[in-house]
Amino acid sequence: MINHKRLSVPRILTPVALAITLAACSSGPRQPDGVDVTLEPTQSVQNYMIQADSTEGSLRNDWLIMATKAAIQANQFDQAELLIKRLARQQLTEVQQAEWQLARATIQQKQGNYSQLLQLLNFKPWWKLPNEQWKDYYLMRADAYQGLNQAFEANRQLVAFGQYASSAEQREISSRIWMNFGSYSEYELTSLETEPNEDVLDGWLQLAVYAKTLSGNLSQLKNTLERWLSENPSHPAAIYTPEEIQNILSLDIVKPNNTALLLPLTGKFSPQAQLIRDGFVFAMMNDRNRDPSATLTVIDTNAYNADQIKQRLINKNIDFVVGPLEKENVELLHTTMDGSANGPTIPALALNIPEDVQPDSNICYLALSPEQEAAQAAKHLFSEGYNFPLILAPKGSFGERVTEAFNKEWRKYSSNKVAASYFGDKRQLQKDINEVFGLQESKQRIAQMQSLMRIKLETQPRSRRDVDAVYIVARSTELTLIKPFIEVAINPDAKAPQIFSSSRSNSGGATYEDLTGIIYSDIPLLIDPDPSVTAEMNELWSEQSNMEKRLKALGMDAYKLIGELPQMKVVPGYSVGGQTGILSIDNNCVVQRELSWAERGAL
């Protein structure tokens, strides 16, 4: 008889408990309750999708949002759009809704669809969100408005961003706000309006208006800015003052009282020097705000050596120098007045541009530069919508320099290659024009075909069709020959390119050939002069060629710039109307002259 033994309860439960414990250990890590969806993705889309598919509810939405962000980061926009549509059907928290909107907006931002971005990105003001999300929101909207050239609206978003920004970010935002306001004209600024609750934005606008309206009086501008900042110490502009405003506040405003004019009044360049001197004195005598005690010392640079000139500057207590004119003397200026043992530090406006311009806060440069004019022509042609320019210039180093200047500027705006041709002997002019327009090649191809086929073909040479604008650097006598040759070289059924010319063609003499339709550049004094200035100049100098007027205008602008250069150095984008153009400076203090353009009428 089999004896059955009873098993005790403790002995039965022990292996069961062990099995449960082992099962718990093998079930893997516990899923998190939530994911910080404001962070940047660190995994692939697939990894985030695996985690999303193994969860549910709000946590699944978190993983789907991270998968969406990973897809956008990898530029997988189709995948991202599918995930965005999937999320649109879910119940999202405020933080998730914000991140979903930011994801949609990021796709539009990457594709340059700024208007669409602004429509999609609209947080509710009552949402309780982390600061980082509000910062992303306002910054993305600011960038979108910037892309739409709506700088004021961009500033509105940047001011809102400032509520959540760190000190370092505040400083950067302040500079950006100030730069945006700098893109507006005085008239545009005064027409901008803020809302009643936009005190910070309104403060920035007030400062910008002051900077524009008082830019012609740096002393008054400095005093006004100092007073406003002291009255508004808690405004971001007072705490995180942009560098441009700091430069104005730190400026020691001293108007030159003893000016020296250095020119070669004898020798080869004497005629040009005397015309510049006459223009300078003309402007000085017409300056109603001139200090009666101010002095002018005119020094002939051919009558004294560098050491003698330096000593005269010291003896006369000169505090500003205009000149010299000759390039080699301009290069000596750095060593003569560099503030070292070689000489005193005296601010100067040189009347030529050396080959190698070195940044120097004390020396600026003004010249009637053909290279500057050619570069400006390239910019003008592009802004007018022309895509395939041809430049015609004289053979030799001068023509090569202006062509290179045109090319260099054109490359800033377009990858299209500039066609270039050089002309020389007038007897070869028609052949040169035919070659550049492809007429010679066309004739050769026709001749080859006739030779091969041994029959006379009824055809005519075809000119190239890829040139839509021609810029010509030529004298008026050369231009009168070039224009008809171009017209003959163009096929009757092709659209003729627009012809532009430099000021070199505007001699002021009588024109006996038809130059109708040619658009040319020149200084404002010759294209759009002030009638009162013209009348007074005609009274003083009855007969003046255009070249003589340009040199006098250079002297007039040299005088004007003595008072304007301090503003130009500290106010970005500052410009002033002059007789040789709209004047501004670049980073090397080379004066840039924006010329005027006009079209020649019929004879």
From Swiss-Prot:
The keyword RNA-binding does not apply. InterPro entries: LpoA, Peripla_BP_I, TPR-like_helical_dom_sf. A lipid is attached at residue 25 (N-palmitoyl cysteine). GO terms for molecular function: enzyme regulator activity. CDD domains: PBP1_YraM_LppC_lipoprotein-like (cd06339). GO terms for cellular component: periplasmic side of cell outer membrane. Residues 1-24 form the signal peptide. Pfam families: LppC. SUPFAM superfamilies: Periplasmic binding protein-like I. PROSITE patterns: PROKAR_LIPOPROTEIN. It is a lipid-anchor. It comes from the Bacteria. A lipid is attached at residue 25 (S-diacylglycerol cysteine). Gene3D superfamilies: 1.25.40.650, 3.40.50.2300, Tetratricopeptide repeat domain (1.25.40.10). It is found in: Cell outer membrane. GO terms for biological process: peptidoglycan biosynthetic process; regulation of cell shape. HAMAP family: LpoA (MF_01890). Interacts with PBP1a. Regulator of peptidoglycan synthesis that is essential for the function of penicillin-binding protein 1A (PBP1a). This is Penicillin-binding protein activator LpoA. It comes from Vibrio antiquarius (strain Ex25).
